[in-house]
């Protein structure tokens, strides 16, 4: 089959005395039938290339499905007289949300299950389903949930009467994907945020149950197009907090849930560069702020005097404080120290760290727990330890293991190894990596290795257990995650050093990680693949230009690769919100810096690795046209005969197809491609179970 070749239509961009040629700009017009024809031609080519790998794909997929437990159930969380949980049955695509009425956890086994929401039933109507936020009224009689069926960020609120099982007539459209819906205490009103034409959440509304949505009252509007609007309820349920925030500045108002018709109360006005978060505890507000504290400090002030702030604990620059979890009897803080997630209990003005046994792990306080609880649920996992839920007794400080997530099939953790590695980046910066592999995988020299990275928005790539990774580990594949700058694994400064005019650090850190793995004989350029999605797709796309010779395969998923053009186009969803992350190319300094690494603008006439690229036609975060243009230019310019494929999902968005088996199928396809290029047989198995 011949290569798909996109036609070239000259479209120069001129700015700051510079001209950027963009012959594939026309691919942005999804209403143009030639655009759809080109995407479908690329899809046909993709399927032609993947046809010889069908058997390998199926073998990988089946090995992943074999790791799906017969049933999975989350540890029930108590709210009043009910315990709420979700469960996932072996052959189901989606979870089932349920509850049991019981006086204590010990009585749950004999209690009767009531299904609150079965996503499998909802999904029968369409190929795609996403349900994100779910909110229960205080009296447990009504459930509001957000639903989407096209892969965009525009969701609709549905409200279910749990006494009758029927949906109410209330339907609220155009609501943001998350952080966008809360009930007042009485359950007669629901607050929600809607998006503008660019899918930016910017308006807060109040809806009275049973009334026409057209009569809903606009409570607040965020008019600065570099800010977004989110809402969340305090742990105590007393307040709804309304967040106006950019990536560098925040402002918060609050609503008393007992007085839903009362006006908003401002906590602290926005000041450039000052970020803060709030919570309610006892008679005070807790404030987590970066004012005078790069890694954030914890303050408190009386509800009747918000200007009187005092420190809760002394600021420690080695600790990055990120989340507050106030309960009636104790205050827990989540954050980072020494490159790892941590949880502390506030006691007598000090932070007492909860200790764990492994050197590498990820730990988090589960969200949406009852303020009155004496048992806080904490989730723990590592590269080798499945998700484990502990109950922390707030009175004694003791941890009790409540559940270890089931792993289907044989799994002996003693046959695997996890470790932390350090590469030396530019200016001597030490770049952390986490690695997991089969014992003995490195005994015979360089091993096939997949290097993953993200490194943007301060998001972290922490060590987590993945049962679907086990079949690949058993084949001798080494998995490494590079915790590059742009994430916040090493604190807030780690993030600041990987954004804006420091963005190239993200890419050079990743390259340093790859070189370290080669130098230390973990792998070789002929045996290494690079993976990343979204902003991680930008990472591996930039690295393909800067140091593609280090990799045999590069796999960018929904990649952000046309940085300058996108950041100049304010008609694209979320563009204005991103200027504090990447820069504003209307400014000359930002323009030339962004151009220096943008993958699309730096494609050269040289050899590139094998590349497997995915995108979604309805993606609101990274337009399909970015990878489409990139692939078209690569096909026209690159000098090698290596395989380049692009798969466009014609019915989904940024997160691909919905349903867990669909996700596994897509993962199996990409792994089949990677293993084929790395020379690993799909049926090959290094591990012989003892």
Swiss-Prot record:
Q: What is its EC number?
A: 3.4.21.83
- Gene Ontology biological process terms from the UniProt entry: proteolysis
- InterPro entries for this protein: AB_hydrolase_fold, Pept_S9_AS, Pept_S9A_N, Peptidase_S9_cat, Peptidase_S9A, Serine_Peptidase_S9A
Q: Which UniProt keywords apply?
A: Hydrolase, Protease, Serine protease
Q: Name one GO molecular function term.
A: serine-type endopeptidase activity
Catalytic activities:
Hydrolysis of -Arg-|-Xaa- and -Lys-|-Xaa- bonds in oligopeptides, even when P1' residue is proline
Q: Where is the active site?
A: 534, 619, 654
Q: Superkingdom of the source?
A: Bacteria
- Quote any Pfam family the record assigns: Peptidase_S9
What is the similarity comment for this entry?
Belongs to the peptidase S9A family.
- The protein's role, per its UniProt record: Cleaves peptide bonds on the C-terminal side of lysyl and argininyl residues.
Q: What is this protein called?
A: Protease 2
Give the species.
Answer: Moraxella lacunata
